[in-house]
């Protein structure tokens, strides 16, 4: 069993505590030119070793950047991209993982249908409700700006929409998001390591819960833009200080 397979199994176990509100669809982890992902039909239980397959990234990226492609062609390419031949059920949603892992420069990705988040995303406000922060941890952990996508059908259409949004987001904000909010659908969490993925997921669940509750009492009291900027600046300064201290300690050894 590879380390990345172990990481996916570990994440499945740790995120189990958030069920049933957090419906885990799939978790992936990136290797060099490939990625590991669990099958779409394992989302009602803990992920098992046999649910996980390895796929080459490049063929998936070519699909996402194609102007036109048929469903049979998509499934043929995904099937041929499989490295570890298993009985795993092939899904066009694997494209989401390939695009997120590569173009968002993430190492781990969680796609979920969170009830708490979807209560907000399925409303008239949709992802706009997350344009403001109601507590400082969401700024620090989830990032100042989550990315969002209007409803798109699962598979190829959603994958290409994610590709376009990531490209646009980076041009506007000069960085990549940690969260993709999929209106009337769910969430994609993008992380550098397994622990960060769990922390972002838990914080987003709380953020959504607070926003939903606040609208029952007249609406959220969002932090001001100055508040958010100050929190972000202070957090960046703290991270830089910690990195400097670590580098200094390593150089003295």
What does each model-identified segment do?
Residues 1-253:
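Glycine-rich flexible loops
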């Amino acid at each position: 069993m590879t380390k990345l397979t172990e990481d996916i199994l570990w994440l499945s176990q740790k995120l189990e505590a958030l069920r049933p509100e957090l419906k885990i669809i799939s978790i992936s982890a990136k290797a060099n030119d490939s990625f590991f992902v669990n099958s779409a039909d394992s989302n009602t239980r803990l992920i098992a070793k046999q649910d996980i397959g390895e796929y080459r990234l490049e063929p998936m990226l070519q699909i996402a950047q194609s102007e036109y492609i048929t469903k049979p062609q998509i499934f043929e390419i995904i099937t041929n991209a499989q490295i570890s031949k298993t009985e795993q059920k092939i899904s066009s949603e694997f494209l989401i993982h390939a695009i997120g892992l590569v173009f968002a420069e993430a190492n781990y990705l969680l796609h979920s249908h969170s009830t708490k988040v979807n209560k907000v995303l399925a409303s008239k406000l949709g992802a706009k409700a997350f344009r403001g922060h109601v507590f400082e941890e969401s700024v620090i952990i989830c990032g100042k700006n989550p990315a969002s996508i209007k409803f798109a059908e699962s598979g190829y259409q959603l994958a290409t929409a994610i590709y376009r949004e990531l490209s646009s987001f980076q041009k506007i904000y000069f960085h990549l998001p940690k969260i993709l909010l999929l209106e009337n659908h769910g969430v994609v969490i993008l992380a550098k390591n397994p622990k960060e993925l769990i922390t972002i997921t838990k914080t987003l669940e709380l953020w959504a819960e607070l926003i939903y509750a606040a609208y029952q009492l007249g609406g959220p009291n969002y932090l001001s833009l100055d508040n958010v900027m100050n929190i972000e600046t202070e957090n960046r300064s703290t991270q830089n200080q910690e990195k400097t201290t670590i580098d200094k300690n390593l150089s003295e050894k």
